[in-house]
Design a protein with these regions (language model features):
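Cysteine-centered catalytic environments shared across enzyme families
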Residues: 1-210
């Protein structure tokens, strides 16, 4: 089932972000990874089912672009063969490795080519935008919220990745606490409604489409 996380701020360390990721280690017990970039932070907890080699670990990169996905892409081998004929090369047998090539070929229309259940976060370095999306049926969970300290958006597979729980019992955290726990004080924690996608560009904010 895996776990994905993303945060658009730069006020949280990778180590602290990984602590939030590890709260749901049962979703991704095989491996965990956190990366930093112009977009902020992105994390993945792996439950290895397909593409079991190290090359199947996410985030998947092509240049400065990257993606994490909790999902299953049915019939992905058909799309993969089409992409291979168009010159794309693949390092693993993981279904989610085709996501960036699909995005390059079709942009946001990529979802029309996906017979799948998914929750994903993708960074496009050329347009400097972060894209979060969820499958039309809503099988794979994806929550989001905004940090009180910097008003940056965060996404995660489970609510507990985004809230501090017992570690912040005060109604309004102190400035020191807020600085160390930007994800601990989320304004709202709705689940992204299916079908759903959001694009984010600094510093202009967000645009959403449902």
């Amino acid at each position: 089932m895996c776990c994905v996380m993303g945060y658009t701020g730069h006020d949280l360390s990778a180590a602290k972000f990984k602590e939030y990721l590890l709260r749901t280690v049962m979703r991704g017990p095989d491996d965990q990874r956190v990366v930093e970039g112009p977009f902020g932070l992105m994390g993945f907890g792996r439950l290895a089912i397909m593409g079991l080699t190290p090359e199947g670990m996410q985030p998947f990169y092509r240049g400065a672009d990257c993606v994490v996905c909790n999902g299953e892409l049915y019939g992905f081998r058909f799309e993969k063969e089409i992409l291979k004929r168009r010159g794309y090369k693949f390092a693993s047998d993981c279904d989610c490795e085709i996501l960036l090539p699909l995005y390059y070929e079709y942009g946001l229309d990529m979802f029309r080519h996906m017979d799948s259940e998914f929750a994903l976060i993708l960074y496009d370095s050329r347009k400097d935008r972060l894209i979060a999306a969820r499958d039309p049926i809503g099988i794979r969970p994806l929550f989001y919220g905004y940090s009180k300290s910097s008003h940056q958006i965060a996404f995660a597979s489970e609510m507990q990745n985004l809230i501090a729980g017992a570690t912040t019992s005060a109604p309004s955290p102190s400035a020191a606490t807020t600085a160390m726990a930007a994800l601990s004080a989320m304004r709202t924690l709705p689940m992204c409604p299916p079908p759903w996608r959001m694009t984010w560009r600094p510093p202009c904010g967000t645009s959403a489409k449902s």
